[in-house]
């Protein structure tokens, strides 16, 4: 371990550049902040840009919350050409001259098929594993296996613009959604095939592109400005309801890890003690099923 690394705690929201891997962004940020511990919250493909939250220190304990959070993307689909990976980085495997005449009305009828609860098959070029092997490694070896479908939700699917052979869409979706698969499926529905040529993540959980930093921006900041760019752990849960501890509940929670049933609570809840955020609790119909404590007042801890 590098001497004198800093024990930072919190989240930095990065606007990832194109053609850079998520892991490279993580390592560069860790070096830039001289941080002891850091982790990202789900990879963006190298060709993709946009929101990539990086967790420092204790915030790595809640990375799963961001992995499970809803996401929003802007995607551009090229019609009439299919690739083995479903995006512009793959090899062309099929071409079709039969691109239908596009109109806003026609495309709306197509996109309507993909809103709501959707069954999606992830692409072979993905990090999902088959018998312990990542699918993308099998794909690079020319192997094809049956990939299990998964249930996803597409909350919003909006047509932004289109041309004779392409369309740009905005997608708000649940975890586990592959935009490459969506591009492939839209191309199939149009009868001409298609692949993803551009992808930008505009939101991950509560974090939006407007609050994200480019790595180049952070490199030019002073130490104090870099620290100020770290948002506290509570920011991950800013959209969750708050429960303020009663005085008689504090000993049970802090000393014995107990919490009386709360019939009115369900899902993820922020726990406050004297107007201070101290924990995240998971409730299932009023019963406490999980909790995590945080001391998130200081970004640099001893």
UniProtKB/Swiss-Prot annotation:
The keyword Ligase does not apply. The keyword tRNA processing applies. Pfam families: TruB_C_2 (PF16198), TruB_N (PF01509). Its EC number is 5.4.99.25. CDD domains: PseudoU_synth_EcTruB. It comes from the Bacteria. Belongs to the pseudouridine synthase TruB family. Type 1 subfamily. One of its GO terms (biological process) is mRNA pseudouridine synthesis. SUPFAM superfamilies: Pseudouridine synthase. Responsible for synthesis of pseudouridine from uracil-55 in the psi GC loop of transfer RNAs. It is an enzyme of class 5 (isomerase). InterPro entries: PsdUridine_synth_cat_dom_sf, PsdUridine_synth_N, tRNA_psdUridine_synth_TruB, TruB_C. Keywords: Isomerase, tRNA processing. NCBIfam families: TruB (TIGR00431). The active site is at residue 45. This is tRNA pseudouridine synthase B.
